[in-house]
Amino acid sequence: VVDACFEVLGAQTERYALPLRQLLAYVSAHEWRKKGVLIAALNSNIHPHYGVFSPISGEYLELIKSASLPNPCASAWDIGTGTGVISAVLAKRGLKTILATDTDPRALACAQENFERLGITEQVQLHQADLFPKTDTKADLIVCNPPWLPAKAAAPIERAIFDEKSQMLKGFLLNVSTHLSAYGQAWLIMSDFAEHLGLRTPNEIPDLIERAGLRVLKKYDVRPKHSKVLDTADALHTARALETTSLWCLVLDT
């Protein structure tokens, strides 16, 4: 319990009290951080920290592992890196120059720890930035996996799940073209779960892609396999049973 609280709150010089539910959340996060989550696409574990989205459902990572890379592909950016898992998959594919960004100090610390465990710190650089790094250099591949639900987060820990008014999704799509090399690709990972809940229209993402001056080169789809898909008692079962996660490979529409 002491370790769990220290990881979230840091060193405290005074006594304090916590709601039991909050304490249990800290302890649960500590256990996940300690044992890690096995990522099939890496054949290794990723260790999430408290408040950083845990890649428990890793089907989308298999898409990143197998999708055709741009040619050439000398550099890649991972926008909103979180645990760093996407950067790790790209590094495993052989990319030597990867730049990973996030706004959250917890996520940056988490990603750094995972990169050190995986021995890829020479391949990946971390930058604290809102979406794109401040650099004049363009990238051959820019990957983003924004939160999938366009709703307001009630707590900081929910920011990895909810993207209020689709701000991150829109910010990525409408600005990524200025950061791509001439033959580069932008990869968007997005579930249609929000569509099945009536929170997003089926045309919203294609319309954003067109507005951004991009076109779809290829689209890879995968159906989730996590246990909630089979749980008929789940209030969201119907939407989960229909859900598809897609990797949109986008290029400049020239």
Model-derived features: where do they sit?
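N-terminal auxiliary segments of SAM/dcSAM-dependent transferases
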Residues: 1-37
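Conserved SAM-binding loop and adjacent beta-strand
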Residues: 29-31, 49-65
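Conserved SAM/SAH cofactor-binding pocket of Class I
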Residues: 57-144, 150-154
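Short "lid" loop at the C-terminus of a central beta-strand within the Rossmann-like core
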Residues: 148-149, 166, 191-195
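Glycine-rich S-adenosyl-L-methionine
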Residues: 156-181
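Conserved beta-strand signature within the Rossmann-like core of class I S-adenosyl-L-methionine
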Residues: 183-191
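Class I S-adenosyl-L-methionine
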Residues: 205-252
